[in-house]
A protein has these predicted regions:
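Conserved N-terminal segment of class I S-adenosyl-L-methionine
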Residues: 1-101, 124, 151-182, 186-200
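A short helix->loop->beta-strand "cap" motif at the edges of active sites that frequently abuts
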Residues: 63-64, 131-133
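A short, conserved alpha-helix within the catalytic core of class I
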Residues: 117-126
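Conserved beta-strand signature within the Rossmann-like core of class I S-adenosyl-L-methionine
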Residues: 133-140
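Short "lid" loop at the C-terminus of a central beta-strand within the Rossmann-like core
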Residues: 141-145
């Protein structure tokens, strides 16, 4: 990942008061929690953690170490300081050259990250190198994501493409991509996302 890759959320979907967004996020978080429960990891590395919303949730859910990593950004570092937990560490780094040894974490996650990076295969390769058991990844499901943006009048000049989205996958296309890095144990479709739990 490079400095041209955006950090944080373009739209605060986790803090939105919009009832439709809240309903979508409730389903997203429920499916994600079920996949994490299936994986039951003792340690987690969250690649592209952004503000650390999910990273903090995971640190509260497991006793083992949880590390969030993202690009250098003072705004993110302010958020990270607010999310302090005894087993939680945030640090800066690149998804395509993770500063950890092989199989250093039981689970490695990238939630809403791969659509932003110039080389998703390089990031997934690094994630699978560092994971001893699991990858948990999610991306916007296309063309549904862009269509919903258009319906709500967002990003019309870019045909509904959210700023910073460089890559776009259908559910099948995403399964084909992540399936190269292990066995897909579960593939979920909480609208408008695709989410996969992969055994490495």
């Amino acid at each position: 990942m490079t400095a041209a890759v955006p950090t944080g959320n373009t739209y605060d979907k986790y803090g939105s008061a919009n009832p439709v967004v809240r309903r979508l996020m409730t389903r997203f978080e429920r499916d994600m929690a079920e996949l994490l429960e299936t994986a039951a990891p003792a340690s987690i590395l969250d690649v592209g953690c952004g503000e650390g919303v999910l990273t903090e949730q995971w640190a509260r859910a497991i006793e083992g170490p949880v590390v969030g990593i993202d690009l250098e950004d003072p705004k993110l570092q302010e958020e990270w300081q607010r999310r302090s937990q005894p087993n939680l560490v945030f640090r800066t780094g690149l998804g395509d050259s993770l500063p950890y040894g092989e199989a250093g974490f039981e689970a490695v996650t990238a939630m809403e990250v791969l659509e932003h990076v110039p080389d998703p295969a390089a990031v997934l390769g690094e994630m699978s190198r560092v994971a001893s058991r699991w990858l948990l990844v999610s991306v916007p499901r296309e063309p549904l994501w862009r269509a919903l943006n258009m319906v709500r009048g967002a990003y019309l000049r870019d045909l509904g493409n959210t700023p910073g989205h460089l890559n776009h996958w259908s559910k099948r296309g995403f399964a084909d991509l992540v399936g190269r890095y292990g066995e897909i144990v579960e593939l979920c479709s909480p609208p408008p996302w695709t989410m996969a739990l992969v055994r490495v």
